[in-house]
């Protein structure tokens, strides 16, 4: 049996972390430039 709730939460957290990481990286890149 697959834990769909855990899988959904994990995917949501990973997607949010990736989106937040990209925005954070862009803000740093803009400060350097």
Curated annotation (Swiss-Prot):
Compartment annotation: Virion; Host membrane
Membrane topology summary: Single-pass membrane protein
Residue stretches spanning the membrane: 5-25
Protein keywords: Host membrane, Membrane, Transmembrane, Transmembrane helix, Virion
Keyword Transmembrane helix: yes
GO CC aspect terms: host cell membrane; membrane; virion component
Coiled-coil stretches: none
KW Cytoplasm (keyword) present: no
Function of the protein: May initiate with G7P the virion concomitant assembly-budding process, by interacting with the packaging signal of the viral genome. The assembly-budding takes place at the host inner membrane. In turn, G7P and G9P are present at the end of the filamentous virion that emerges first from the bacterial host.
Family: Belongs to the inovirus G9P protein family.
UniProt name for this protein: Tail virion protein G9P
Organism the protein comes from: Enterobacteria phage I2-2
């Amino acid at each position: 049996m697959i834990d769909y709730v855990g899988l959904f939460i994990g995917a949501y957290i990973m997607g949010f972390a990736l989106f937040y990481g990209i925005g954070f990286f862009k803000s740093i890149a803009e400060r350097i430039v």
